Structure formats: C-alpha cells, structure tokens
From Swiss-Prot:
Catalytic activities: (S)-malate = fumarate + H2O
Superkingdom of this protein's organism: Bacteria
Cellular component, GO, one term: cytoplasm
Localization: Cytoplasm
Listed name of the protein: Fumarate hydratase class II
Site (described: Important for catalytic activity): 329
Principal localisation: cytoplasm
SUPFAM superfamilies associated with the record: L-aspartase-like
Pfam families on file: FumaraseC_C, Lyase_1
Pathway(s) served: Carbohydrate metabolism; tricarboxylic acid cycle; (S)-malate from fumarate: step 1/1
Function: Involved in the TCA cycle. Catalyzes the stereospecific interconversion of fumarate to L-malate.
Its EC number(s): 4.2.1.2
Length: 461
C-alpha cells in the first residue's frame, strides 16, 4: 500500500496514499481503535454545511480570498453529494469535544480544495486550520454540526415515518367505527368500546408526538458557531456566527440562527435532551401500541384473537405452522433501545464541566441512533403489520356478549350495589348477565333489553 507523509504539531506520520485525510485523523485512527461505531456520516454532512457556510462568511468578512472560498465550497459540495464518505473513518469513541472529527473534515476539505486549486492553475494553498477552520474551534463546530445533522434527520426521516403510521391508524379508525368490542382496563373486562375508538387512541398518541417533535426541534435550530473556544468568540468576527447561520439556512432550507448565548451553547445540550425526551415519549407510545396489537392478535386459538395481523414469516424452528407477531417484537425492542439511549443522553448532557461539555459524540451517536431506529421501525411496522390489521368479528362478538361489565348500564336504574350483585351471581353460577339480572328480581326481561345496548354504551352522549 502506498503512503504519503503528513505532519502536524506532533511531527510527521504516514497516511495511506489513497486517502484524503491528514495527520490528526491518522493519529486518531491509531489512538482510538475502540468499538465499531463510526462517527455518523450525517454529522460529517453537517460539518460540510458548516465549513461551506464558514468559507462564505469569512470571504464576505474579507478574511478569505475568492479562490480559497470557491475551493472550500467545491470540496464541501462533494462531501454533501456523498462522494467522499470513505475518507471519514473515525469512531464515536474519541475526544469528547469531537476535535478529531472536526479535523478529519478540515483535512479532507483542504486536500480536495488544494487539488481543485492546482487543477485550476491557481497558485494558492489551503491549510486545514488556518483556512478551513478559520474563525472556528472544535468546541463550537461540533455542536453546530450536531444540530444541523439532527434537525435534518428529524425533518427528512423521522417525521415522514411518523406521519405514515399515523395515517394508517386514521384509516383503520374510520373503517372500524361500526365494530363494537369489549374494553379492557387492568387486563380485566370493562365497558364496551368501538374498535375504531380504540385505534383512535393510538392515532392520537402519534398526533401528540408529532406536536411535541415540532416543538422540540425548534430549539435545535440554534447554533453554537461563533462561540469558538469557550464562548467568547475569540479569533472570530462578531458577525461571523450570524453570517454562517444565514448561509447554512440558505443551503439547507432550514431557519438556523446563531445562539444568543454561546457559553450555554458550548457547555449545555439541553436542547438535545429535550429532543430525545420527545423520542422517548414516542418510544413509550409505540411500545404501548405494539403490545396492544400483539395481545389483541394473540392466539390463534388460545388467545384473545380479536384482530388478525399479517403473517410474514415462519415463527418457530420446532413448532410447524407457528407464526409470531414479529413486527410488534421488533418495535418493542426499538422502544427499549431508545429508552436506554435517553438515559445515556441525559447523563452525558449533565457533564458540561465549566465551559465545555466533553460527551458530545456519545450524545450525538445515541440521538441519531434513536431517530433512525424509530423512523425505520415505524416504517416497517406500518408496511408489514399495521396496514394489514383486520378484525375477527366472531371472536369480538363472543367476548362482548359474554362480558359481565355490560352490567354498568344498569347502574343508573337499579344502583351500583344491586348491579354488582347481578354480575357476581352471573360469574359465580355460570349464568349469562341477562339470566342473572332477571333472577335477581330487580330487572325484567323487557328492561334488560332496553337498558343493555352496547351501541348506546359506546356513544353515551
């Protein structure tokens, strides 16, 4: 393998000849052979948006020549097209400020930009620190790239998947408004409910999560850029942060702004904690929904079996013909992982000692993982399970007709205690509710038929 010699303030080091990174990236590769979790490419794209905006801002402020600005923008655009992904090899488990990933981007951008200048016959050279990282510090660039990446992934991946599943439940909700089934509380029989009403609860959970997500992602639009090392903005023009935010906004279509307090932006990640809290809320709702669906689909002959769900693959290596609710199991595992990630994000975000939080990569890694798991999980759950939910009306009607909790409709007519006696007698003696009610002497057959109407119980108003 061919190599070339690169150098940094520690001296010279060999770098693979076909790779565009430089000395600091190579040192990080050697110093941190930890785990297999690569720094997410999405944050590299966030960095590319930032470096692009920084070049335009520095140029506008008279700190960067036309040629250097054009070369840096060219290199960043190549990164954003996904053409340079192989040149970003670093793992999550590195310095807590993300300095090495910032330098990885600086080095690749400078390498590509210098090639561009040479091809254009321009006698200038671009330095990773002095030009690509001009007016910046890893301490304000990494959190900026974090926010750019997180906002984009919520906008383009999570929200569409959430809406997709929500729309499916809305369709099922409307379709099954005429099917009346027994409700359940405490895992015990309760008063009747429409299947459409039950599904409406699931749909509304996703509506609320959509609202919470829209609110929490607003705070991710605030960028740390301009704070440089400790929030004072040393070595940066006072307008640098505002200009970079403007250029990033123009290129992404999102309304990013420069944070009004850079000291906060470097040492606190409460905006991400809030965002991940919303992800946890969504995970909790998805856990509940998936559990409800697999319980309602349990069976086929010794479970509830009120609904059927698609049969996607064999469920057992030993029991022939067995089919399992695998999509529900997948989604509940996703929910558990997201809840665990929330703990990590919360603890990591509490570690902002003095002027800098140095747990940034793990905060980013866990939050992005949660976004991807939830987005992919909802999409596949929708396509392979939710769209195929169908009622098993024979079982639904049998449970409804056998339920003792229909007795609740007698409360206004004979009182709670007499109604309770009727239900207990029916259960103890194996009677139908109607038989027990008539035997009690408190209710005639005609009154029972008039008062016990499940269709009235699901729409009492």
């Amino acid at each position: 393998m061919s190599v070339r010699i690169e150098h940094d303030t520690f001296g010279e080091i060999e770098v693979p000849g076909d790779k565009y990174w430089g000395a600091q990236t190579e040192r990080s590769k050697r110093n941190f052979p930890v785990g297999k979790e690569r720094m997410p490419i999405e944050v590299v794209y966030g960095f590319a948006q930032l470096k692009r905006g920084a070049a335009l801002a520095n140029h506008e402020l008279g700190k960067l020549s036309d040629a250097k600005k054009d070369a840096i923008v060219y290199a960043c655009d190549l990164i954003l097209k996904g053409e340079l992904d192989e040149h970003f090899p670093l793992v999550v488990w590195q310095t807590g400020s993300g300095t090495q990933s910032n330098m990885n981007v600086n080095e690749v951008v400078s390498f590509v930009a210098n090639k561009y200048l040479k091809e254009q016959g321009i006698d200038e050279s671009i330095h990773p620190n002095d030009d690509v990282n001009k007016s910046q510090s890893s301490n304000d660039t990494f959190p900026t790239a974090m926010h750019v990446a997180l906002y984009h992934e919520v906008e383009t991946k999570l929200e569409p998947a959430l809406k997709h599943l929500r729309d499916t439940f809305k369709e099922k909700e409307d379709k099954y408004q005429s099917i009346i089934k027994i409700g359940r509380t405490h895992l015990q029989d309760a008063t009747p409910i429409k299947l459409g009403q039950e599904i409406s609860g699931w749909r509304y959970m996703l509506d609320k999560c959509e609202e919470l997500l829209a609110e929490s992602k607003k705070h991710i639009l605030s960028l740390a850029i301009g704070g440089t090392a400790v929030g004072t903005g040393i070595n940066a023009h006072p307008e640098f942060g505002n200009k970079v935010a403007k250029f990033i906004s123009e290129n992404t279509g999102y309304n990013f702004v420069s944070s009004e307090n850079k000291f906060h932006a470097l040492t606190s990640h409460d905006e991400v904690v809030q965002l991940h809290g919303t992800l946890k809320a969504l995970a909790a709702d998805l856990m509940k929904i998936a559990n409800d669906i697999r319980w309602l689909a349990s069976g086929p002959r010794a479970g509830l079996a009120e609904i059927s769900i698609p049969e996607n693959e064999p469920g057992s290596s030993i029991m022939p013909g067995k089919v399992n609710p695998t999509q529900c199991e997948m989604l509940t595992m996703v929910a558990v992982q997201v809840m665990g990630n929330d703990t990590t994000v919360g603890i990591a975000s509490s570690q902002g000692n003095f002027e800098l939080n140095v747990f940034k990569p793990v905060i980013l890694h866990n939050t992005l993982q949660s976004i991807y798991l939830l987005a992919d999980g909802m999409q596949t759950f929708n396509d392979n399970c939710a769209v195929g939910i169908e009622p098993i009306e024979e079982n639904i009607n049998n449970y409804l007709n056998q339920s003792l909790m229909l007795v609740t409709a007698l409360n206004p007519h004979i009182g709670y205690e007499k109604a309770a006696q009727i239900a207990k007698k029916a259960h103890k003696e194996g009677l139908t509710l109607k038989e027990s009610a008539i035997q009690s002497g408190h209710v005639t057959e005609e009154q029972f038929e008039e008062w016990i109407k499940p269709e009235d119980m699901v729409d009492p108003h």
